[in-house]
Amino acid sequence: MPNIDLENNRLISFDGAELGLTVWDTEEAPEIVVVGVHGMNDYANAFHMAAPYWAARGVKTYAYDQRGFGRSVGRGEWPDEDLMREDLRTAIALVKARHPDATLAVVGISMGGAVAMSAFGSGRPPEGVDRVVFSGPGLRGWGTIPAIQRVALWTSVRVRPGWVVRPPRFVKIEPSDNIEMLRRLWSDPLGIRTNKIEQVHGVVSVMESAHRAAPNLPASVPMLLTYGAKDIVIPEKGLRRTAKRLPGHVRSAYYPDGYHMLLRDLQAETVFDDVLAFLRDAEAPLPSQVGPVPGHTAR
C-alpha cells in the first residue's frame, strides 16, 4: 500500500517499490508544501540548498529518490518512464493526503522537470497540484540530437544495452559555478558517476516525451519554467525547441548568470526567492525581474 514512512526515510510507491525520501520540515504547519523531483544521476539531495531556505520561510519539502537512483530500488538501472510518472502521481497523492489544506507544488529539476512535464501534459495529469516549477528542465530529446548520433544510440541500446559509457576526459562540462558544491557532489556515494547506454537512451526518451507533452500542459495549474543562460547540460537549442510549444499560461524566467544547477549555483538565492514568490502568488512579479526564456512569447 502506498505510504510515506518518515521513520525510515522512504516512500512506498503504487507498486510497493521503496523510494528514498528526504523531508525538510518547517517549525509550524506549512502553508506551502513542495514535492521535489531530482535530475539524472542525482537524488533528493538536489534540494539540499533550496529546501532549508524555503523551510525557514514556511515551505515544507518532500523530495524522493526516483527509482533507479539514490537510495531507491533498481539503482543503476533505467526504469520504464511510465513508472517514473506513476511514482510522481503517487508522491503527490500521498503528500496531498498529509497536507490537504496547504498549497501543493511540484518542483522538477532537469530530468525531474522532464518527468513532471510529461506527466502533467499526459492524458492523466496528476491531481491536486496548485503550482509546478520546471527548473532547468531536461529538454534535450531526440529532435535535438544529430542523426548520426541518434542512429548510434538506437543501435547501441539494442545490441549492447549494458555498455557503460563515459565522457572523454577532454570533455569538461560545468553544470554550476558552485565549485565547492560540485566537489561534494562528485564524492557523494549516493550519486551515479557512469551510465549504461540504456540509461542514456532512457533519459533522452523521457526528455522527448516532455517536449511532445508541452502543448498539453493544463491551464488550470500555474507553471513556471526557469533556465540559466550558461546551461551547457541542456543547450539552449533544446529549450527553444520546446519553449515555442508551451501554452500561454506557462511563465518563464531566464537567468543571465545561471547554470544548469540553478538551485545550487552561487546565485541560487535569487532563484529561491523567485520560486518562493511564485509559490505564494502565481501572478506576482518575480523579485529578480529577469526576462522570459528565449523563444518563449508567453508571460
Feature-to-residue mapping (PLM):
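The serine-hydrolase catalytic nucleophile loop
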Residues: 39-52, 237
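Conserved alpha/beta-hydrolase "acid-adjacent" motif
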Residues: 232-238
